[in-house]
Design a protein with these regions (language model features):
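Structural/interface elements that position substrates and couple domains in central-metabolism enzymes
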Residues: 1-120
């Protein structure tokens, strides 16, 4: 598993993580990535993190996506904070797969619920 984020947001135990220093490194080593939902209120509580610098360094933009391979798949756990973890110009790029994820959300939950109830 690789991680590309501000060093102040990394977990204490990084033993099994590959730490990437740039989007280029991410794209060299990945054909699928999962963005994480950034909670602005949590970042603002961390004095060592400048929110504007975080966005400038880590936001997925159209320019960044243009550097990636054509078959890259970008996933997101939702809800998406457009303008924070992904820019408005990148959200409709075909590499962004949140609409596919949404189409599977309810059926996946139904199956999980039935499984827990031993119905399948």
């Amino acid at each position: 598993v690789g991680v590309f984020t501000d060093k102040n947001l990394l977990p204490d135990n990084k033993n099994d993580l590959e730490i990437y220093e740039s989007w280029d490194e991410v794209f060299e080593n990945s054909n699928a990535i999962e963005l994480l939902r950034v909670q602005k209120e949590r970042l603002q509580d961390k004095e060592e993190i400048n929110f504007d610098e975080y966005i400038n360094s880590y936001q997925l933009t159209k320019d960044v996506l243009n550097k990636s391979q054509s078959d890259l798949a970008v996933l997101h756990p939702m809800p998406i904070n457009i303008g924070i973890e992904i820019s408005e110009d990148a959200i409709e790029d075909s590499k962004i797969k949140y609409k596919d994820q949404l189409s599977h959300a309810i059926p996946s939950r139904i199956v999980a619920f039935k499984y827990v109830r031993d119905e399948i």
